[in-house]
Swiss-Prot record:
Cofactor(s) required, per the database record: Mg(2+)
HAMAP family: S_AdoMet_synth2
Role summary: Catalyzes the formation of S-adenosylmethionine from methionine and ATP.
Organism: Methanosarcina barkeri (strain Fusaro / DSM 804)
InterPro entries: AdoMet_synthase_2_family (IPR027790), AdoMet_synthase_3 (IPR042544), S-AdoMet_synthetase_arc (IPR002795)
Residue sites binding ATP per the record: 136-141
GO biological process entries: one-carbon metabolic process; S-adenosylmethionine biosynthetic process
Gene that specifies this protein: mat
E.C. no: 2.5.1.6
Name of the protein this chain belongs to: S-adenosylmethionine synthase
One Pfam family recorded for the sequence: AdoMet_Synthase
Superkingdom of the organism of origin: Archaea
Database matches in Gene3D superfamilies: 3.30.300.10, S-adenosylmethionine synthetase, C-terminal domain (3.30.300.280)
Top-level class of the enzyme under EC nomenclature: transferase
């Protein structure tokens, strides 16, 4: 059956040439990102358990994880958690299959604890966190939709969007958080995982505003704190030259009041310890960024089942499509993908698969159109590859 693929030329100024561009990334220790990470870790653990016990991934969604902030008393050289962070793992899961009972809650709790251990290395999971799990069973009609055919059918009428390539600012914002928490943190453990990077490009001038929670046990006093933020600033300024030739100004923790020693200091490295709650889907999109200059889906990707949940599959698929179009069709300057499903219809047959293309100057759109259609059709023909990549941990969701 022919697919409803529509490729059109988009007549607008490419993002890279627009006057104002905004890009945000919430770091892996931001409460919203923690929620995303927990939800996805639980989903992937359930997938592995279902495959091990039942031979197939069964219906589940764990995309409602909530974090209720605790209370803390950070200080230089230490600090303590006064009230633990409360984490509620919420969703739906298949708990019995053909007479086999499945320990879904135990699997979920184990996966969540392991994710926190790997992500927030300064958190004491015995003292600092209360973990709860409430997984209900899925509705019978959706479970039926889940298992009808070889090609899964859509669980909902919904859409996913993606774009490529990243702009200079998008690359810079994404890699600033990644490099600070992988490279610099290995030498400067006082950098907390709770970080937000906000990028503004005004013409040829870029401002990066970085809000980074510092960990008190590794910092002796205010002077040490100031030195650390200055070293971070220098690191980012030097790193930025690898991503752009534009002017870059770096600002660290602009909310600090050094006169009163009111600074972003934490015990564990996340503001979830003191007043900052978290929810799935309130942070980064599945490409790792929040990009108001681009079309975005408001739907959470993390925690949704990777078999037929359009909120997950089509957002990931559209992003992969866009990236491959840019790789394989070098005449494309910007491409935006939109995929729309109908509930109960095969996910390889979207109601529409739309590509909006801004070709490079002097390029034949007819050539671009034909080559983009081939990439899109190939991905739709192999749509279940997205499921495999998710289960293997090859695709990020935030």
């Amino acid at each position: 059956m022919a697919r409803n693929i529509k490729v059109e030329e988009l007549f607008q100024t490419p993002v890279e040439k627009q006057r104002i561009e905004l890009v945000e990334r919430k770091g892996i220790g931001h409460p919203d990102s923690i929620s995303d990470g927990l939800a996805e870790a639980v989903s992937r653990a359930l997938c592995r358990e279902y495959i091990s016990k039942c031979g197939a991934v069964l219906h589940h969604n764990t995309d409602e994880t909530q974090i209720v902030a605790g209370r803390s008393s950070p200080r230089f050289g230490g600090g303590e958690i006064l009230q633990p962070i409360y984490i509620l793992l919420v969703g739906r899961a298949t708990k019995e299959f053909e007479g086999v009972d499945l320990a879904t809650e135990s699997v979920a709790l184990q996966a969540a604890r392991q994710y926190l251990k790997n992500t927030l290395v300064n958190m004491d999971l015995e003292r600092d966190v209360i973990m709860d799990c409430k997984l209900g069973t899925g509705s019978s009609d959706l479970r039926d939709v889940f298992k009808r055919d070889r090609i899964p059918v859509a669980n909902d009428t919904s859409f996913g969007v993606g774009h490529a390539p990243f702009s200079e600012l998008e690359n810079l914002v994404y890699n600033t958080e990644r490099q600070l928490l992988t490279d610099l943190k290995s030498r400067m453990p006082g950098i907390g995982e709770d970080m937000k990077v906000m990028g503004l490009r005004d013409g040829e001038d870029i401002t990066l505003t970085i809000c980074s929670g510092m960990i008190g046990r590794y910092i002796d006093d205010l002077d040490s704190y100031i030195n650390m933020t200055q070293e971070m600033q220098t690191y980012v300024e030097e790193m930025a030259t690898r991503y752009t030739e534009r002017n870059v100004k770096v600002c660290i923790n602009t909310g600090d009041n050094l006169k009163t020693s009111s600074i972003f200091l934490t015990v564990t490295g996340t503001s979830a310890e003191m007043g900052d709650d978290g929810s799935v889907g309130r942070g980064n999109r599945c490409n790792g960024l929040i990009t108001p200059n681009r079309p975005m889906s408001m739907e959470a990707t993390s925690g949704k089942n990777p078999i037929n949940h359009i909120g997950k599959i089509y957002n990931l698929l559209s992003t992969q499509m866009a990236r491959d179009i840019v790789k394989q069709v070098p005449e494309v300057q910007d491409v935006y993908i939109r995929l729309l499903s109908q509930i109960g219809k095969p996910i390889d047959q979207p109601l529409v698969a739309s590509a909006q293309v801004i070709p490079k100057e002097g390029t034949s759109f007819a050539k671009v159109k034909a080559e983009a259609e081939v990439v899109m059709d190939d991905w739709l023909s192999n749509v279940t590859k997205i499921t495999e990549m998710v289960i293997k941990g090859e695709l990020d969701t935030f």
